[in-house]
């Protein structure tokens, strides 16, 4: 997926991180998994959103990518 395929909010933050106005997190995969886990665990959110977050987190955990 490319940044231009993402929503406006993602593109905005991408631009801010790239310009140095927003902090960059070197362990991006860990950050993503933690965020997706938080979404999946939040019972106040719709079930479909929680299931999608859980599926994405599980796939990241199984993938070959690893923060070092």
UniProtKB/Swiss-Prot annotation:
Disulfide bonds: none
Pfam families registered for this protein in UniProt: UPF0253
Domain of life: Bacteria
InterPro entries assigned: UPF0253
Xref: NCBIfam families: PRK04964.1
Similarity remark: Belongs to the UPF0253 family.
Cross-referenced HAMAP family: UPF0253
Protein name in UniProt: UPF0253 protein VF_0662
